[in-house]
A protein has these predicted regions:
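A composition-driven surface/loop motif
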Residues: 2-529
């Protein structure tokens, strides 16, 4: 039986503390684990056919799968079902990354205020509108006060637009409109500064509803090393109704709606992004196919201020690296204002994240895996929330302000450093529906009849909670790690709270909290003090 002792000098309220030390575990915070439960990795979900490669070349990217070794020697802990990551092997093609062009053989378009000039027969000019109809490379420079560039070519055509100090404003439509092509590449010329804008109105063209400064019905890639500033007083910044890929460049986007938006997928290899949006900063969603609408970010620098979500995916969201400063400001009960959000799995392998949100910091309607990275999170709701499995394999997570720190149906901590300052529970494995969440496809919802578990196999966890320190509406299993809980002074809460069984077979746990709801581990525990 585990022994514990009371401490009455922590505060004016009666406070209890449990000191449970490891006899057989490595208390350094890492754990060797021979169990597969809790690792969001392994097999590849081929239904997420990331990045349809139609460029006629092979991708030079290897498949990225989230990984993270995990171990657990506890025979009491049941296995948490694993999930899969995105196959990104053909997300970025060689052509996506190709920014070179031969100026001597390229077609030149010169913007002259209220007119456009070009000597090529593949460019039809009508007033201040130029329509490109053939495959090739087109260099655009100059200023167009009120007009647009239209791509209307063969369905197999690949067209490269080079913006070389180009400024285009359209008062009634997109500055660049891709009506028909196989794929269009927009290259920001080295050293160039380009500006695209809309004057506040979008008029349909041939029954096509256009609602972005750059609007593409087909695959769209942006690359290069120049600067692109987009101002969308109405509608979105950049939209692709197919795949949107960005492999380089500097982007300053101000949009009334989404900053970047795509139906099938968004893939970002690199770039610098400053986005101020009336809705989501980056948004991928496909209402017709649940296996589309995913987002993958390999790296880049992101500064996002959004009234909606910072980065939102209607299917999977996977981040391999990058620097992220995300602020969301939504306040409506029917709106979603999360930092990172996925309707499917949310996977973070590395990166630096500073997230300040009125809604959840990170949210998944399915499974979430944190395999690395550094996080500083201040939120009005949950720090990290998953409707199914929340798995932390590595990383430094500092949740400075939140309602609940970690929340999921099943929570597994295999390693990492986690600091939580919560106004309610520090860690909560929940059943039923949590009404604290905002709207969108991000309401907090759990299956009421599902098994609920918390597994702590390693890492260092420090919790300061006004509610329960660790609360499982099912079972609690501790096999390793260092856990330090400063629980509530309220007699209605406790440092530990569970509804099923609780066992400890390794690690160190020090818990302080009000004695009115104090609970201890069960007799099946092999740990003593």
């Amino acid at each position: 039986m585990i022994k514990y002792k009371y401490i009455k000098t922590i505060s004016a309220a009666l406070i209890s503390a449990m000191l449970i030390t490891g006899c057989s575990a490595d208390n350094s915070g890492s754990t060797v684990n021979d169990s597969s439960h809790g690792v969001l990795a392994g097999s590849t979900d081929t239904s997420a056919a990331a990045g349809k490669n139609t460029d006629g070349d092979s991708s030079d990217n290897s498949t990225n799968e989230s990984s993270g070794s995990a171990s657990n020697s506890s025979s009491s802990a049941t296995t948490v079902s694993s999930a899969t990551s995105i196959d990104t092997s053909d997300m970025f093609t060689n052509r996506d990354k190709e920014i070179g062009y031969d100026e001597s053989t390229s077609v030149k378009l010169t913007l002259n205020g209220d007119s456009i000039s070009s000597s090529s027969s593949s460019v039809a000019i009508s007033g201040s509108t130029a329509t490109i109809s053939e495959e090739g490379i087109y260099i655009i420079s100059g200023t167009l006060d009120d007009g647009m560039i239209i791509i209307d070519a063969d369905k197999n055509a690949k067209i490269q637009l080079v913006l070389d100090n180009a400024s285009i404003n359209s008062s009634t439509s997109a500055a660049i409109y891709v009506c028909n092509a196989d794929k269009v590449f927009i290259t920001l010329a080295a050293g160039s500064e380009n500006t695209l804008s809309n004057g506040g109105e979008y008029i349909a063209i041939d029954d096509n509803n256009i609602d972005a400064v750059i609007f593409s019905k087909d695959d769209l890639t942006l690359n290069g090393s120049g600067i692109l500033t987009i101002n969308a007083g109405t509608g979105h910044g950049i939209v692709s109704k197919d795949d949107l890929v960005i492999t380089g460049g500097t982007y300053n986007i101000t949009a009334a709606s989404h900053g970047l938006s795509a139906n099938d997928s968004i893939g970002i290899a690199d770039g610098s992004f400053t986005i101020v949006s009336g809705k989501d900063g980056i948004h991928a969603e496909n209402s017709d196919d649940e296996a589309l609408g995913f987002a993958y970010i390999a790296g880049g620098d992101f500064d996002i201020t959004a009234q909606g979500d910072g980065i939102s995916a209607g299917y999977y969201l996977m981040i391999d690296n990058g620097s992220y400063n995300i602020t969301t400001k939504g306040t409506g009960s029917d709106d979603s204002a999360k930092g990172l959000k996925a309707a499917g799995n949310l996977i973070v392998n590395d990166g630096t994240f500073t997230i300040s949100t009125t809604d959840d910091g990170l949210h998944s309607n399915s499974d979430m895996s944190i395999n690395g990275g550094s996080f500083t999170i201040a939120t009005g709701d949950d720090g990290l929330h998953a409707d199914n499995d929340l798995i932390i394999n590595s990383g430094v997570i500092d949740i400075t302000d939140c309602y609940e720190g970690l929340e999921g149906l099943n929570i597994t901590v295999n390693d990492g450093t986690i600091n939580i300052n919560a106004s309610d529970d520090g860690i909560n494995a929940a059943g039923g529906t949590d009404s604290s969440g905002f709207g969108g496809f991000g309401h907090d919802a759990f299956s009421a009849d599902s098994d609920v578990n918390i597994y702590i196999n390693g890492g260092t966890i420090t919790i300061n909670a006004d509610g329960d320190g660790i609360d499982s509406n099912g079972n609690l299993y501790v096999t390793g790690g260092g856990i330090y809980v400063s629980g509530p002074e309220s007699s209605a809460d406790g440092a530990l709270d569970y509804n099923g069984e609780a066992t400890i077979t390794g690690g160190t746990l020090i818990a302080a909290g009000a004695s009115g709801m104090a609970e201890n581990f069960g007799s099946d525990s092999t740990q003593g003090s």
